[in-house]
Amino acid sequence: MTTLKLDTLSDRIKAHKNALVHIVKPPVCTERAQHYTEMYQQHLDKPIPVRRALALAHHLANRTIWIKHDELIIGNQASEVRAAPIFPEYTVSWIEKEIDDLADRPGAGFAVSEENKRVLHEVCPWWRGQTVQDRCYGMFTDEQKGLLATGIIKAEGNMTSGDAHLAVNFPLLLEKGLDGLREEVAERRSRINLTVLEDLHGEQFLKAIDIVLVAVSEHIERFAALAREMAATETRESRRDELLAMAENCDLIAHQPPQTFWQALQLCYFIQLILQIESNGHSVSFGRMDQYLYPYYRRDVELNQTLDREHAIEMLHSCWLKLLEVNKIRSGSHSKASAGSPLYQNVTIGGQNLVDGQPMDAVNPLSYAILESCGRLRSTQPNLSVRYHAGMSNDFLDACVQVIRCGFGMPAFNNDEIVIPEFIKLGIEPQDAYDYAAIGCIETAVGGKWGYRCTGMSFINFARVMLAALEGGHDATSGKVFLPQEKALSAGNFNNFDEVMDAWDTQIRYYTRKSIEIEYVVDTMLEENVHDILCSALVDDCIERAKSIKQGGAKYDWVSGLQVGIANLGNSLAAVKKLVFEQGAIGQQQLAAALADDFDGLTHEQLRQRLINGAPKYGNDDDTVDTLLARAYQTYIDELKQYHNPRYGRGPVGGNYYAGTSSISANVPFGAQTMATPDGRKAHTPLAEGASPASGTDHLGPTAVIGSVGKLPTAAILGGVLLNQKLNPATLENESDKQKLMILLRTFFEVHKGWHIQYNIVSRETLLDAKKHPDQYRDLVVRVAGYSAFFTALSPDAQDDIIARTEHML
């Protein structure tokens, strides 16, 4: 078996990482807000695609750039290290309200200088009434506004933070280079017919792409000039040589395809960076990096031996730390659902390739190098995912487990055995299906061929919908009734449990439809107002169709719906079925009163204990609750299938919705807005995250958990089925324990057809001490949901949620 070298970092990488993890309150950068406002004001007469292209070009030409001491990969998102830019075209309302209090946020604070406050107070008023969020609310119906106000459906993220959730076509970029892409655009423009309406709009889009590609080239040339300027005054010969080499790299990749591993990695990082300057969206991912960078790695490291493996890993480390520098500021409410300020920049390794019609294991030496580099660095970025398949070698799986034992929540695993065949059933070409990658958290898409947002824009609070179904449509939190029904526990008029399920079906269909209506509005406003030009240029077939991603330019386009509180739904329904209708141990009105009182008083607390201990719980491989949950979830899936997204019929294959369970950390704020539930959960406490069991309810070990998760209708949940498991570090101390985990992984993916799994390897005692002494644990990384975060950067509520999760032994 290959033994990875997981305890080695170069001095420069150690210093760089240490400096980054000790930035507790990152600054805010206002340069982008200033530059975009200037160009929007100057070019109001221009079509929006051209206006946005000019704004990006102006910003890239005039923003502050820097090269840090000893870094090997260069490029910065903002004027200061880890500073978060402001994107006023999406929203200014929360910025104006919260700007003075950003430093006081628990776990996600930002430092704002008085000068930056002055700039924002100057810039923001111009945007009032014309941001994406403003225009969404101008289109929402009163009913939709009411639903959003209650929080049963939440869709703030994309109105205020943009789109994304995709990987662009990095292989095409490396093959053609930036000048080659410009040639492709020029050829397409030569076929434009300006007497055709679609082409008239297409010409403006293609013109915008050309403006942006020129701007990107010139921006890279700025770094070449800066590197030469720094080399001229550098006293250390070795660093001077590095700076000159970086200048030469930038000179080449500013126009031509890269020739070396260093150049290829640098070009990919520049594009990754500028994509996140262009758009405020997150989960901008790299796709299958071990595949498209391997030819360069093989030539330099294995064949020509012009680069040794250790130096290649150091370059990867430098790239990963540059990803950690990228930052994002969200509204106070949205930051609670994205605890730890994650960017979800996913790198996928492993899996299979389709070669002459036959699946072949895709693991190569770069797969091992990327895995090892992440295991050594133990950072939150990139979000490393491994594509599992039945033919994966024990050697590579063993290497993955070695990294899992490092305790930073990576790698996560996605399962080829279910993703690929289900993608092919959707209509995705087999060659493309075998080329899928993890996007953001657990979502999957085909890099460079899939439209924005493989994850949806609106979360549905399943627990609150369930409570409404039990109480005649009445939302216990807001007091509102959106869809009235006759039956209610408080009236004691449910005749049997089938009527409870009928009520659930009715309510979830209603809320699902409303979530899609809201998605439509947000999608439409993003399409009309924030064309992301560079991103579209790097997704097939946007150039050929002369359409942005949002207009239907991508080859494929599916969007997943999202929900929070899946396990709470199953556990609550199981408790009502068994204790109220089968045993008659609890009366309908008795349960309703206990829920309304949040189980206050001795009698209600005794009833709560019966709900907790006397009814089956999801996560223990118990069919009575697992199949009930699957049945309830299926109604949501069936309703979702009825709808098309706004790109349907406009070019892409697909244009539909499917389910997904990536709840990020929304289970904490959603729980805070949810009253007591029949599973015994108290009001305002966290809901279950993803498709994982509710904290403290999975008593029979990790094998029972995967048995329960495997009964979900996974094949229809193509947005991903998120499973977090927390293991005590003592569990993986010896070789036999490692073998047990490998067997567990193979069983989950091959027998139970699981979609995804990831592990926290950290003790409760360590987490409690880190909460008490944060300065001693600034580099402690934990798995939150489909992403990892620095534990001390989380809010106290999010920290408590992770501490409360069940800790398993193998």
Curated annotation (Swiss-Prot):
Pfam families (UniProt xref): Gly_radical, PFL-like
One GO CC term, this protein: cytosol
Keywords for this protein: Lyase, Organic radical
Residues covered by the PFL domain: 11-682
SUPFAM superfamilies: PFL-like glycyl radical enzymes (SSF51998)
Enzyme nomenclature, EC number: 4.2.1.-
Domain named Glycine radical: residues: 689-810
Presence of the UniProt keyword Lyase in the record: yes
Claim: Signal is one of the keywords in the record: no
Xref: InterPro entries: Form_AcTrfase_GR_CS (IPR019777), Gly_radical (IPR001150), GRE (IPR051215), PFL2/GDeHydtase_fam (IPR010098), PFL_dom (IPR004184)
Region (Disordered) location: 677-699
Anything else known: Contains a dehydratase motif that is predictive of enzyme function.
Record family assignment: Belongs to the glycyl radical enzyme (GRE) family.
Xref: PANTHER family: DEHYDRATASE YBIW-RELATED, FORMATE ACETYLTRANSFERASE 3-RELATED
Free-text function comment from the UniProt entry: Probably shows dehydratase activity.
Name of the molecule in the record: Probable dehydratase YbiW
Organism of derivation: Escherichia coli (strain K12)
Record gene name: ybiW
